[in-house]
Amino acid sequence: MKLPYSKESDIVIKEANRVARKLGQNFVGSEHLIVALASVADTTAYSILNENGLDIVKIIDALKYTLEPGGVVTGERDKYTMSARRILEDSQYEARRLNSQEVGTEHILLALIKETDCVAVKLM
């Protein structure tokens, strides 16, 4: 059974979608998730990333130069890269492992950091 996402996590996921569209992408990847996690204030992930000196401006600038606009998607499930899907699925595991009743932004961040081959980790 899936745990619900917290209100903050829902906002982060929506922000990741918005960031992808703003950058001209038809998909959401780990890179969009890290930008969203570092952009949505008053969340646990935001605090952790800021306390550890993540420079969101540098990440966004790097994304603008490394990502190409477009990409074909055929449906809602295909909207997320395999890496982003794994991160969101693994965030469920992290929440359960930590005995949480819902998936918080900290669980998404934990899952993202463990996805060592993803674009977001390389940008960090």
List the model feature ranges, each with a label.
Residues M1-M124:
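Histone-fold recognition with a strong bias for associated Lys/Arg-rich disordered tails
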